[in-house]
Amino acid sequence: MKLDYEFFQRDAVSVAKDLIGKLLVRNLNGEELICRIVDTEAYCGPEDKGCHAYQNKRTNRTEVMYKSGGYVYVYLIYGLHYCFNVVVSKQDRPEAVFIRAGEPISGLKTMRDNRNIKSNKKTELTNGPGKLSQAMAIDKSLNGQDLVASKEIYLRHACDSQSYQIIPAKRVNIDYAEEYTDKLWRFYIRDNPFVSIN
């Protein structure tokens, strides 16, 4: 079952934690590529010095963050890697959850082709934000997509009822965020080999 607007229209920390174990589905040329989300980070609006919308800096890039929760926010880093985020919270409250890594469930051959790697090491496919986006064919063309209405990309509950030990941690590579550097707003599954970094 797809996640609904009610799920997304909550604060980023709650959604980031609750997205662990959910499935990211990308429909690509009639094939479903599916990853279980194993690693997330919350970015908590204008007060959060690590957030793109810190001090309500509203730009063309961040405009989608001001929508109500349930939209895709994709941006490029280092001119190379696309980063996939989920807009959360209420209209005009710019919060997002960054999806750092996933565990491939379905469509592994296509993911491998998308990543252009020969290695059969499954963990190499999606164990980081750039790798995940490349494997799942996530790019700027998906920016602003409605995750509830879209058939191209969406999030859903997993059919299994696995339980996970979720570890809270500091977010990665935001040393500039001063007191927000130490917030435990990253969540990942303990001992999962697809987590980006431990």
From Swiss-Prot:
Enzyme Commission number, as recorded: 3.2.2.-
Question: A Gene Ontology molecular-function term?
Answer: alkylbase DNA N-glycosylase activity
One Pfam entry for this protein is Pur_DNA_glyco
Signal peptide extent: none
Under InterPro entries, the record lists:
Formyl_transferase-like_C_sf, MPG, MPG_sf
GO BP, one annotated term: base-excision repair
Q: What UniProt keywords apply to this chain's record, in alphabetical order?
A: DNA damage, DNA repair, Hydrolase
> Which HAMAP family is this protein grouped with?
3MGH
Give the family, as the similarity comment puts it.
Belongs to the DNA glycosylase MPG family.
| NCBIfam families, per the entry | 3mg (TIGR00567)
Question: What is the name of this protein?
Answer: Putative 3-methyladenine DNA glycosylase
Q: Which organism is it from?
A: Natranaerobius thermophilus (strain ATCC BAA-1301 / DSM 18059 / JW/NM-WN-LF)
